[in-house]
Amino acid sequence: MFQVYTKQPPQRFNETIDKKSEKYKILKMYINKGFCIFSFPYMDTYFDQQQNKERKDPHFNVRWHSITKQNHLNHLNLNDTAFAIVTGELSGVTVIDVDDRLEYKRMIKNNPKLKDYFTVQTNNGYHIYCKYDSTIQTRTDALIDYRKTDIRNNLALAFCPPCEYTLLNGKRVKYKFLGGKILKFPLTLKQNLKQFHEPRSNEFVIYSK
């Protein structure tokens, strides 16, 4: 969805702000790590009747496919409540998106070193940040042995702290950085990737020029 946000005047990242705030600290960390981060006004959710589940509905005010390392800070508004990184080569990361906490626990049990990885807690699961791997495709339901696990690489986004939004039941969701380092994509999980071609995730709209 493409909407223009006019509720508040833009407050850009390089303007005078409270540098002690958690919002500033997390954004500064993402920028220092070279992530191609940007913001958009807010995120809603809606109930998908066909899939029988609640889904995110990001209200973009930027055609994010046009965001680059050179211009992404121009699209970082501190008045916004929704934030994302362009994954893949632009940010130097390939993200494992586990949308089920039980599956994440099982994955950690089978791959204990994952506890050392840069990890973000989401509403239903976790994002595990790995060093960019050009041989891995963006895909949904990506692993053979783990359910509800997607790969966010080139031509994809990963919502990130300090992103927050409200569910239909009124619960407030806040993305939280848990710590860790950005390490090489685990070989055990790379070997577990499904090899057949799958369509890209339809969770995000990719705008054409």
Where are these regions (language model features)?
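Conserved phosphate/metal-binding and DNA-contacting active-site motifs used
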Residues: 1-209
